[in-house]
UniProtKB/Swiss-Prot annotation:
Source species of the chain: Kluyveromyces lactis (strain ATCC 8585 / CBS 2359 / DSM 70799 / NBRC 1267 / NRRL Y-1140 / WM37) (Yeast)
Classification via Pfam families: CLU, CLU_N, eIF3_p135, TPR_10
A GO cellular component annotation in the UniProt record: cytoplasm
Listed name of the protein: Clustered mitochondria protein homolog
Bias (Basic and acidic residues): 958-969
Keyword Repeat: yes
Compositionally skewed regions (Basic residues) per UniProt: 1258-1269
Chain residue ranges for the region called Disordered: 958-989, 1211-1269
Length: 1269
């Protein structure tokens, strides 16, 4: 046993077996506390349903926070006595609610906001991947015939689906995994307990109905549960004699229902065979809320949902007090840090949940403002100790910089800084929890208030003019101590606060400066307040980041036409960090030295206040425009970074690189300029090749003439000797020597291809994101003009029908409008399709400084699936569509209708329009408070750094080994035998370090799971990175396991069709192939291929990558026919990408197809493809290029073989005709091949046959280029 562990023995636990010994033993760390022991007991079969019990050590009931090491003292073991404890109302309710979770009343789709939005299901298990077969890592694996058959079937299904559009049904998720094992379990109508029975220990009454329709009434008492004699019409809480009372409710239910235990076992078995990541309820995040939902919630009757609030005896929470109290906790160990982060993560999630619930109540007019006299966006609400205010320029604060538009930007920027503070965990300065909730076009800012700010301090009794006493509220004692005070419109200074804010300014690189003779270490727009708890709070942090002054000067200040909507354009935190890192690196200073240098800090008020400037702020803005944006885009165009799959991926890349989305227009213009440059460069190159080809043809003509002349002259000389009867001199018998100056050595051109998939793909994704954002702004603007949120679905359906339903019904109308509303008062209803399309162009120009063509809709229909734009709009505005067939043309509808059963066809009601308000619901779009685990991140960085260090050491060791081998081959001294033992020691040391690194990475993930729970977005990236680590080590089996986990979590956290999920599945396909599971790999590729139809433009390189990997897998099966089918599909895709232009990658692919046909002895098809390749190589590389000459030689060889085969066939026919009639070939025996030398040869062998042994290397090089277009 480790010295850091303690043996813990729990005695007296209930036993369900005949065994007398029911002791439970654990080895737990000394730093663990009693609550950890309770967690372990909750997984034991005998104690998992016990929620009310004491643990007694040395006759003392221990507290959950007691540390095991402190209880044990110098001892190495601890013994606890397990003792059930009497229930009270709170613990009884907790027991019942907890049991309901176990019994399946809470499905895997439920989270804290399920009443407002539908969560994403999972599809990963539906792929039915075969279990990991533990194939040997890195070694050759044998593929069974059965697996080959299944692979070929899946491969053919994928190939057949290539020319079909995205199928919306492919996103449907299966049935729920977690389903109730009871029909109902809720508090009965006889609650609350009458006073007479309260004295008898009764706490509450329950009613349970089994799946077999048996109903039982149950009494909950301090000693447990028993079935009583009550019925639906009679109250009698006395026990029924035939059933024994039980301490746990589940034991009672098992007793009264014969099939209940069977249902529970069935549910347990179902869950135990599934990864817990698929069904466990999230503890500190919300599940993904998809744009497409498979089905509407069943909403089975469950009284308990409405009853729980009544039995909730928790006092109203004060999130601010709790949040600040957590920061005050002492941290003396890693366990303390872990505990602190876990509490913080849970609190922040609970805050986000309450923020959403409160916001939705306000959106639905269910709450009263603090001042009942205010209405609309002027109203401020106080609910569950949180402040809710609409994001709008109500007081005119931002009127000079954009009004409401500026207010929207300020809210976003404030939240970004607050989330940075959540991560930093500063103690000297405090901040308020904040969230932003968007719903139906309106935005609410939710904050936990500064303590005392809204707390009434009493009233003054005054006498009014009529001599009546009136109670007048006293003003709060809390006011601004530092920074800008709105009430008096002046800047304030406080020495104590000035010192406290120093920690904040250092972390955000803010320069101390003067504004109106007041010294400040923060923005003059921010404010500092001492709460009644005497903690220093900082508010209004939006202007902490510097102004993007280059953008302001170009698009706002002194701009008269098409001015940007607001001046509140700031640089992102990522950009500031990157600028500072580069400046420090260039200076050669250490981080410690740089922290004291004013060269690396900035004035947050620069260019905010007239006349205030800062060189560093201007330099950062220039750095973004001149360096970061261009390097980021060039990185994508050069293939160093993947082209984004969709708008969300694009946004993630922009923000990670510190680029704001307002630069979308500039990004497209940059990409288009580079695209045009490549086109021109290619045109010049092709012109050069064309000229060189003419010169080569001229040389070839002259060369042939010269050779013919030499041959003729030689023949004439030989003839002279022959005519004279003399012996021909040996000199004349030798090969004719040509002048080297007359020869033309072959060249090797690289070609000049335009990366069409890179350029067109990036432009397409950027424009689609711009269009979707522009439409979101139109939706928001029009929604704000509506008198009721119930009208917003009408607006959404109307606009979607205008855009997408034109071919189904040109006369778009507002359907099913309630009689309370007048259609003539609805501004959106007056829009035409042309006006809407033009308005999108206006918004794109205004917000992204880009001129969309008036045909943008038609252009994007050619670039993407129709559903790509619908998806993008839905995600941004919070629309959840039902996954069903939508009809965009009459022809599509009639085809669908004819496919239905004849009996049903007559009952079908023709839809009036493509979309109806019954096809979707609206959900809140949440930008919540975020938290990151620093302790888990530190462990991860340590582990990853160690992995990288070991990898470098292994590369160096391998290099030395190769050098040693080379030296030995050259006859030099390769070193003494002692060197081998040294290498072995070094290898052992590296293995030890690697194990240590992997342990650190595993511990980091374990900490994340402890802090955030088993379902959280941070775990998705962690498991994916861990999978990549194991992949680098060649341990594919483990890599696949972790990648599977990442995929499952990604589906639940991000969605089944998110770019994160697609990226993970793409990795998984490679890993499955790497470990030899070709069927699994094909299944995953099939899923990726279908998702790419929805997410990405048709020209996206991800589609090419799917076929590349599929071809690699097919090659391992040695089925050349399926390989040919794959490459033919790839050729089709390459032509589609280039607009039918036959480019070099297409030629290389045709050459590969020719290889395969040759190996099948199908010379006619081989000739067809090699001729096509030769023609392309001639145009792209030149007639004198080695590749072109090789293909030409190959073509001639194949032609010769075909001619020979034809001659042999004629000869065989002639011989057959002369044979006696009774002599024939044996039935069923095929004639031997005419070209046995080529039959069934590999591609490399064929090239060696044609070109010699050097061919295979060049072939392999050419294969790598086939993705370039």
């Amino acid at each position: 046993m480790s010295a850091d562990n303690i043996e813990v023995i729990v005695k007296g636990t209930p036993s369900y077996t005949k065994s007398k010994n029911s002791d439970i033993k654990y080895q737990l760390g000394k730093e663990s506390n009693v609550s950890h022991l309770r967690t372990f007991l909750s997984f034991e079969e005998s104690t998992k349903f016990y929620t009310s019990y004491d643990l007694i050590e040395n006759s003392r009931v221990v507290d959950d926070e007691d540390v095991l090491g402190d209880l044990a003292g110098n001892g190495s073991s601890l013994t606890f006595q397990f003792k059930p404890k009497a229930y009270n109302l709170v613990t009884a309710v907790q027991h019942i609610v907890g049991l309901r979770e176990t019994l399946g009343f809470s499905s895997e789709l439920e989270d804290g906001i399920s009443e407002f939005a539908i969560s994403s299901g999972s599809q990963f298990q539906d792929m039915s991947l075969e279990p990991n077969s533990e194939k040997s890592n890195g070694s050759e694996t044998t593929i069974s015939d059965q697996e080959k058959v299944k692979f070929l079937q899946t491969c053919n299904e994928l190939l057949e689906s290539t020319n079909t559009d995205f199928n919306i049904a492919s996103l449907k998720t299966g049935n729920l995994l977690v389903t109730p094992v009871l029909k109902s379990l809720h508090f009965s109508a006889y609650n609350p307990v009458p006073a007479f029975y309260k004295n008898k220990g009764h706490l509450l009454y329950l009613q349970a109905s089994t799946l077999e329709n048996e109903t039982f009434h149950i009494t909950t008492s301090i000693s447990g549960f028993y079935v009583n004699k009550s019925s639906s019409v009679k109250f009698d809480p006395s026990p029924k004699d035939e059933f024994e009372p039980k301490f746990n409710l589940i034991d009672l239910l098992t007793q009264v229902s014969k099939k209940f235990h069977q249902h529970v076992t069935s549910l347990r078995n179902k869950l135990s065979s599934t990864d817990s990541a698929q069904y466990v309820k999230p503890a500190s995040c919300f599940l993904s809320k998809p744009w497409l939902v498979s089905q509407l919630p069943s909403n089975n009757g469950d009284f308990m949902r409405t009853q729980l609030e009544h039995f909730n005896n928790d006092d109203e929470r004060n999130f601010c007090d709790e949040f600040q109290a957590i920061k005050d906790l002492e941290i003396n160990s890693s366990y303390d840090r872990l505990k602190n982060e876990k509490i913080t993560a849970g609190l922040i999630h609970e805050f986000n949940s309450e923020a959403v619930k409160g916001a939705m109540a306000i959106f639905n007019n269910e709450l009263t403002p603090i001042d009942p006299g205010t209405t609309g966006e002027n109203a401020v609400y106080f609910h569950k100790s949180l402040i809710f205010s609409f994001v709008a320029d109500v007081s005119g604060t931002y009127s000079s910089i954009g009004g409401n538009e500026a207010a929207y930007a300020v809210a976003n920027q404030d939240l970004q800084i607050i989330n940075s503070l959540n991560r930093l965990g500063l103690k000297g300065i405090r901040h308020c929890l904040t969230a932003i909730i968007d719903y139906a076009g309106h935005r609410l800012l939710v904050q936990s208030p500064v303590p005392g700010l809204l707390t009434p301090v009493g009233v003054n009794i005054i006498v009014d003019e009529e001599d009546k006493e009136v109670a007048e509220p006293m003003e709060t004692l809390i006011s601004v101590n530092y920074g800008y005070d709105d009430f008096v419109a002046t800047l304030k200074f406080d020495e104590k606060f000035h010192e406290k804010v120093c920690e904040f300014s250092k972390n955000f690189y803010l320069k101390e400066h003067k504004v109106e003779e007041v010294d400040l270490r923060i923005s003059s727009k921010s404010k500092g307040i001492f709460g009644v708890d005497q903690r220093a709070y900082i508010l209004d942090l939006a202007n902490t980041n510097p102004v993007d002054i280059e953008f302001v000067k170009a698009h706002y200040d002194d701009v008269k036409e098409n001015k940007y909507p607001h001046r509140q354009v700031l640089l992102r935190r990522e950009l500031v960090e990157r600028w500072r890192a580069e400046k420090i690196a260039a200076s050669g200073k250490t981080l410690q030295e740089a922290s004291e240098d004013v060269s690396f800090i900035y004035n947050p008020d620069a260019y905010v206040i007239d006349g205030v400037e800062d060189e560093n702020v201007a330099d950062m803005s220039k750095f973004l425009n001149d360096t970061v944006l261009t390097l980021f885009l060039e990185d994508i165009l050069k293939g160093n970074s993947n082209i984004p799959y969709d708008g969300q991926h694009l946004t993630d890349l922009f923000h990670t690189n510190g680029v704001n989305m307002r630069y979308l227009g500039k990004a497209i213009e940059f990409v288009k300029a580079k695209y045009e440059d490549q086109k021109q460069e290619r045109a010049k190159y092709l012109s050069k090749i064309e000229q060189e080809n003419k010169e080569y043809q001229d040389w070839e003509t002259g060369y042939l003439v010269k050779v013919e002349k030499l041959i003729k002259e030689r023949q004439e000389e030989i003839n002279k000797y022959v005519q004279q009867g003399k012996e021909v001199p040996s000199k004349l018998k030798e090969q004719i020597q040509l002048d080297k100056a007359d020869l033309k050595e072959p060249v090797r051109n690289e070609g000049c291809t335009v990366e069409v998939d890179q350029f067109e793909g990036l432009i397409a994704v950027c424009e689609l994101e711009m269009i979707a954002r522009s439409i979101k702004h139109i939706f928001r603007q029009q929604s704000k003009k509506l008198s009721s949120p119930t009208l917003v679905p009408h607006l959404v359906a109307f606009f979607l029908n205008l855009l997408f339903g034109k071919s189904y019904n040109e006369s778009v109308t507002v359907e099913n409008l309630d009689a309370l509303f007048d259609i003539n008062e609805l501004e959106f209803a007056q829009y035409t399709r042309e006006q809407l399309i033009e308005e999108v162009r206006v918004q794109a120009k205004l917000r992204f400084r880009y001129d969309l063509t008036s045909e943008w809709f038609d252009i994007n229909e050619k670039r993407f699936s129709k559903y790509a734009l619908i998806r993008a709009i839905a995600q941004k505005f919070g629309i959840q569509l039902i996954n069903k067939e939508y009809f965009f043309t009459k022809e599509q509808y009639e085809k669908w209708k004819q496919a239905q059963d004849k009996k049903l066809r007559s009952k079908i009601v023709d839809p009036k329009q493509t979309f109806s308000i019954n096809d979707f619901s609206l959900r809140p779009v949440i930008k919540g408070a975020e938290f990151q685990s620093l302790i888990a991140e530190e462990l991860w960085i340590q582990g990853a750094s160690l992995v990288n260090a070991v990898s470098v050491e292994e590369e160096e060791a391998e290099k030395k080994k190769e050098e040693s081998k080379k030296a030995a081959a050259d006859g030099e001294d390769a070193g003494s035998s002692g060197a081998t033992s040294k290498e072995e020691e070094q290898a052992k040391e590296r293995a030890k370090k690697m194990n240590e690194a992997l342990t650190l990475l595993g511990q980091s993930i374990a900490f994340r799971e402890d802090i955030f729970g088993l379902v959280h977005p941070s775990l998705v990236s962690s498991y994916l990175l861990l999978s990549n680590m194991y992949s680098r080590l060649g341990q594919y089996s483990q890599a696949v396991t972790f990648c599977n986990k990442a995929a499952l979590l990604s589906e639940r956290c991000y969605g089944v069709d998110s770019f994160e999920t697609v990226r993970i599945l793409s990795n998984l396909a490679y890993l499955e192939y790497g470990q030899g599971s070709i069927y699994n790999s094909a299944l995953v590729l099939k899923k990726v291929h279908e998702l790419l139809k929805l997410l990405a433009p048709f020209v996206h390189s991800g589609r090419v990558n799917v076929f590349n990997l599929l071809f690699q897998i097919a090659a391992s099966t040695e089925d050349k026919k399926v390989q040919i089918k794959i490459l033919n599909k790839l050729s089709e895709l390459l032509l589609k990408i280039t607009g039918s232009e036959e480019t070099l990658p297409y030629g290389q692919n045709e050459s590969r197809i020719a290889n395969l046909y040759t190996s099948l002895d199908d010379m006619s098809h081989a000739l067809s493809h090699i001729e096509k390749a030769k023609s392309i190589f001639s145009k792209e590389l030149g007639l004198n290029d080695q590749t072109t000459l090789t293909s030409k030689q190959w073509s001639e060889t194949i032609k010769g073989i075909i001619t020979k085969q034809q001659q042999e066939k004629k000869l065989a026919s002639a011989q057959q005709a002369t044979k006696p009639a009774n002599i024939s070939q044996k039935k069923g025996k095929k004639s031997s091949s005419s070209s046995p030398a080529l039959t069934n040869k590999s591609v490399d062998e064929l090239l060696q046959f044609i070109e010699g042994p050097g061919a295979s290397k060049s072939s392999k090089k050419s294969k790598k280029k086939h993705t370039k277009n």
